[in-house]
Curated annotation (Swiss-Prot):
Its cofactor is FAD. SUPFAM superfamilies: Acyl-CoA dehydrogenase C-terminal domain-like (SSF47203), Acyl-CoA dehydrogenase NM domain-like (SSF56645). Gene clusters encoding host-selective toxins (HSTs) are localized on conditionally dispensable chromosomes (CDCs), also called supernumerary chromosomes, where they are present in multiple copies. The CDCs are not essential for saprophytic growth but controls host-selective pathogenicity. This is Acyl-CoA dehydrogenase AFT10-1. Disruption phenotype: Reduces the production of AF-toxin and pathogenicity. The lineage of its organism: Eukaryota, Fungi, Dikarya, Ascomycota, Pezizomycotina. Acyl-CoA dehydrogenase; part of the gene clusters that mediate the biosynthesis of the host-selective toxins (HSTs) AF-toxins responsible for Alternaria black spot of strawberry disease by the strawberry pathotype. AF-toxin I and III are valine derivatives of 2,3-dyhydroxy-isovaleric acid and 2-hydroxy-isovaleric acid respectively, while AF II is an isoleucine derivative of 2-hydroxy-valeric acid. These derivatives are bound to a 9,10-epoxy-8-hydroxy-9-methyl-decatrienoic acid (EDA) moiety. Keywords: FAD, Flavoprotein, Oxidoreductase, Virulence. It comes from Alternaria alternata. The gene is AFT10-1. GO terms for biological process: fatty acid beta-oxidation using acyl-CoA dehydrogenase. Disulfide bonds: none annotated.
Length: 432
């Protein structure tokens, strides 16, 4: 049996795709990898350019994506298996066998479509919002809201950022006042991914005093009176459905409160570990997409009487991208192994990984930035054109910045990683 899988372009695939000496992956991982790649290449990749031009992914595509098990895979199959009913996971992996490395494979292989907008449309809201519902929702809430998501009949988004509040979550101003059996919500959430087509928004709202101790999380239906949405025209990710959502005296049943009242800030902080690991996986696969396209271009493009690939300068650029991808992915795999060994549920925090998740996201985003820049340098005008061999690199050059900023900016996460790691090391030192 051959262990080789995928591209022969150097550094275009994770090392375990071509090397059998790897203890982290087994036959179910290889089966999943093959299943996801076949699906993405046949049903998603050929249509990304059209969907980005249209500014949306067709609803029947999103529903089929969920029906094939990808919504459940993004949330945490072992935690939602009782809500899956007839839905089977990609690669036919049993929910009880699903681990963190299966999740990494899905995040990696779906991103190979080469369009961040399409990638986000297929499941960003599910990936970042639904783990909160799984980890903090009541059994009644999970039974009501999870089955439609898993079957592709409804979609979620996460509303945190506001027009005047970005990284400073503790000072958000969207307010929810309790009146009897309802919360009355007023305020605006901005840059909400999937906000144009989501059915529900898990929103951070102020229910108490100023600061982090006065924030709660509400699951707000988006088809009720007082909710208005406006699509935000961004540099990239056109099909991702980025929106501004305004709440004007919106009535939300008190039973839609997730977790404890005024504990929402801490719930959000715990959810970011999974969120940032997912972003890191996306960044590194998209960096590989750039590398692969630049390498293939360099094989055929002639300059000064020989192919680009025969110029040492070009090979050095490709090597630099490969160095960053390989080292960053090794960090991501180590973090994934740590999460697995600690039996961390997706979306929950565990002592010792918050700072590592932050710095892994920073490293992956920097790698993606480098890959975009150097691939454009190699491909020249072809990678500045929305048609031809450089169209994916051109598109990703517009998509890339949102992954550097979103999910925590490089500056915020770098500073946080030092502070958090110092706390964790001091805690570890005092452990028996």
């Amino acid at each position: 049996m051959s262990y080789f899988f995928g591209s022969t372009v150097p550094f275009a695939e994770p090392l375990w795709y071509s090397r059998p000496e790897n203890f982290r992956y087994n036959e179910s991982h290889r089966r999943l990898r093959e299943s996801v790649r076949g699906y993405i290449e046949a049903e998603i990749m050929p249509f990304c350019t059209q969907w980005e031009a249209d500014g949306e992914v067709p609803s029947h595509v999103l529903k089929r994506h969920a029906a094939l098990g990808y919504a459940a895979a993004l949330i945490n199959p072992s935690a939602v298996k009782e809500h899956m009913h007839d839905v089977r996971l990609p690669g036919d992996v049993p929910p009880r066998e699903w681990d963190e490395f299966h999740g990494l494979i899905v995040a990696d292989e779906v991103a190979r479509c080469g369009s961040l907008g399409v990638l986000w449309a297929l499941g960003c809201g599910t990936a970042i919002a639904c783990p909160i519902l799984v980890n903090y929702g009541t059994e009644e809430q999970k039974a009501k809201f999870l089955p439609p998501v898993i079957h592709g009949e409804s979609r979620f988004c996460l509303g945190i950022t506001e027009p005047e509040v970005g990284s400073d979550i503790a000072n958000l101003v969207t307010r929810a006042e309790q009146e009897g059996n309802y919360f009355i919500v007023n305020g605006t959430k901005k840059w909400v991914t999937n906000g144009t087509f989501a059915d529900y928004c898990i929103a951070a709202v102020r229910t108490g005093q100023a600061g982090r101790t006065g924030i709660s999380l509400l699951n707000i239906p988006l088809d009720v009176a007082g909710v208005s949405r406006e699509k935000i025209e961004s540099s990239g990710v056109a099909s991702g459905g980025t929106a501004s959502i305004t709440f004007d005296n919106v009535q939300v049943p008190v039973e839609n409160l997730l977790g404890e009242k005024n504990k929402g800030f801490y719930m959000l902080m715990s959810s970011f570990d999974h969120h940032r690991s997912w972003i890191a996986a996306n960044c590194l696969r998209l960096a590989r997409v750039c590398l692969e396209d630049a390498y293939q271009y360099a094989l055929t493009r002639q300059t000064f009487g020989k192919p680009l690939i025969n110029h040492q300068t070009i090979r050095l650029k490709l090597a630099n991208i490969g160095i960053q991808i390989t080292s960053s992915y090794a960090l991501l795999e180590s973090l994934t192994e740590m999460r697995q060994n600690l039996s961390v549920k997706m979306g929950q925090v565990h002592r010792g990984i918050g700072g590592l998740c932050a710095i892994t996201k920073v490293a992956a985003a920097r790698t993606f930035e480098l890959a975009v820049r150097e691939s454009q340098q190699i491909m020249g005008a072809s990678a500045y054109t929305r048609t031809g061999p450089g169209l994916r690199v051109e598109r990703l050059s517009r998509d890339m910045r949102v992954l550097v900023i979103g999910g925590g900016s490089e500056e915020i996460l770098s500073e946080m990683s030092v502070v958090q790691e110092q706390k964790d090391l001091n805690r570890c030192k005092s452990c028996p």
